[in-house]
């Protein structure tokens, strides 16, 4: 179990991957408004599709892939839950999305980074570049209620942050006596992971007779 934390080593390990300066790889959250996003996409005709991705209660992701022209034409509808739907057969929402009430709507999330996934085996004839799909993390709505894992996590974090602020407001925290708790504006939760490379390392050496 080899954990690589050194950036220089990591770059050598994944040195086979080279970024193409002609391709767009992500759209940072909050950096572009509607017109900025549409202008950026217009400059990259190799991005042919958009994929809205939602996570159900079992942790499975479900996505709907749509031509980029529809996304650009009906941009606002994608953030209002009016553009893309799926049925309950593709998601796990026990006793929520039922057979006779299965419609689930996607709502694109504008508060997170969007990424572009390229298919190197499918080259765009007009540009000579691989065909790209803009992947947008999304929420899932059923009967006007957010029901997906991401929305539950978001509400949980918002609730815990508010309760923590109430709990420590005006109080002295041991080890942080000089910290002005009353001035805390927000509590932000982050998650982290580590990139691991698994290698086979025999624990014993054997002598084999031929």
Model-derived regions: residue spans:
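ATP/Mg2+-dependent ligation/transfer catalytic cores
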Residues: 2-210
